Amino acid sequence: MDLVSASQSYFKRIFQEVSDLKILLLEEDTTKIVSSCITQSNLLEQQIYLTVLLGNKREKLRHLKCVAFLRPTPTTLRLLCEELRDPKYAEYHLYFTNVIPKSFLERLAESDDFEAVKSIQEFFLDYLVVNNDLASFNIPHIIEDSPDNWQDGAFHRTHQGIISLLLSLKKKPVIRYDNNSLLCLKLAEEVSYTIQHESQLFNFRKPDTAPILLLLDRKNDPITPLLTQWTYQAMVHELFGIDNGRVSFSNSTSDNEKSTEIVLNPTLDPFYKETRFDNFGDLGVKIKDYVSHLQTKSTKKASEIESIADMKQFLEAYPEYRRLSGNVSKHVSLVSEISQVVQRENLLEVGEVEQSLVCNEPQSTDFNDIQRLLFSNISENTKLRLAALYSLRFERIDPAKVSALQQMLIAGGVNPLKVSVIPTLLHVAGYSFRQGDVFPPSNLFSRARSGLKGLRGVENVYIQHNPFLKSILLDLIQGRLKETTHPFLNSETRAQTSNEKPQDIIVVIVGGATYEEAHFVSEFNATQPGVRIILAGTTILNSTAYIDDIMYMSTRIK
């Protein structure tokens, strides 16, 4: 189960089926999907003459063929019908990212007066490929007017994304879901209905062990998206945001105020692929070695030029050297900027307080630590994160201090509208609305265990936290995941598979996944033979996106 391989094999087939120079016709969503899988140079190698957007004004190029890669939506249908009534290319080969309704095909046929359409196929790639085991449906908000109600568009898009994901991986799964989530239940029922209704599409060879589709609700772990991150990929997303593989940041060490945009793609960048899950301390060592490698290569090349033949050999290798040099420069600039933000935001102290708050027994000093940081020179977002984490931890233990923190935020100049995030968060993902506990239990046994942990020490004080997903997946793989918390949708499949240890697991987090969870999944795939996990989220969260989503909910929940 490799999303990068699946997506690349799709595009390889598409471009091989349509020979000669061609136009690639996309729309807004599929532009993002294509750019998450293929580079511009790959497109040129496949004889793509031009990439254009459906609905934009374009000149007619009747000597060229057109490959269209589109989502089967009402908007796409309308624009495509207009295109076919006045075709701009010699012939059209239509590839859709998902199941095409019969009515859709009928409308296309009615509009194709010039018989320009030569082929129509379904290629199931209705999601963004982030890592080889991580996908996103790119939906920032999913709630309508209550924590239990989907927005219609978000529900339809998530459902389509899951169906496409299952079909691209060739899996007909057994479905389990968070028992306390009406969002997950509705989604599970709709996915199950589609699997039954499209039985021919899901007519795969029956495996020895049924794959599992596990639907989880973000509300059961509101902690993970709020924490400071300390591994490379997660840090970049937390501090700058990764938007479909692109990162923009301002270089604070330069007089130039223009932002820098770079591309981070583990498929194309071996250094990034190797280091994306490294913690910040190890990353500094790897960057130093990477720079030393470049310097050694540069010195060696220069000293070896003694003849015309040597010069020719150097020039032939020069493009590769320039590429390596550019990549080194990119990562040095990015890590340097991360260091600046860590220092400016006092993230070392913030991170230590956060980890103590969520991983250890509640302490009387926790409030003083948070209070001191709230009145320090850190950003509004960091203050909100700290207050939100404290509120989630102490909402039952000391509600008066939770309320006092909100007043401190306002007194410290934080917009009251943003402060409303905290009561909304507690209403959506507080103790009464979660199942299982994301915090260590407060009892004598846990205190003894905490003491032992302290004696042994931890590998890194900043990465003590484990996402709640870890315990869920460990229980699932060991056959211990309770049906009271994660029931099977279908009682018949429950009887057949309840004692089986799954091998293929597709996890979808409604409300968004994080890079910390992706790190765990990747680690698990690398260390657990016989188990393969794919993680998908309605979006890929960082703390800013999560707080924005909670703020959005606060304006809509009645």
Swiss-Prot record:
Protein's GO biological process: Golgi vesicle fusion to target membrane; intracellular protein transport; vesicle-mediated transport
Presence of the UniProt keyword Iron in the record: no
Annotated knockout phenotype: displays an accumulation of abnormal vesicular structures and leads to valproic acid sensitivity.
Xref: Gene3D superfamilies: 1.25.40.60, 3.40.50.1910, 3.40.50.2060, Syntaxin Binding Protein 1, Chain A, domain 2
GO molecular function, one term: SNARE binding
InterPro entries cross-referenced by the UniProt entry: Sec-1-like_dom1, Sec-1-like_dom3a, Sec1-like, Sec1-like_dom2, Sec1-like_sf
Alphabetical UniProt keywords: Cytoplasm, Membrane, Nucleus, Protein transport, Transport, Vacuole
Annotated compartments: Cytoplasm; Nucleus; Vacuole membrane
Membrane topology: Peripheral membrane protein
Predominant localisation class: cytoplasm
Pfam families: Sec1
Gene Ontology CC terms, in alphabetical order: cytosol; endosome; Golgi membrane; nucleus; vacuolar membrane
This protein's record includes keyword Protein transport: yes
Role, per record: Vacuolar protein sorting-associated protein involved in Golgi-to-vacuole protein transport.
Protein family (similarity comment): Belongs to the STXBP/unc-18/SEC1 family.
Name of this protein: Vacuolar protein sorting-associated protein 45
Organism: Schizosaccharomyces pombe (strain 972 / ATCC 24843) (Fission yeast)
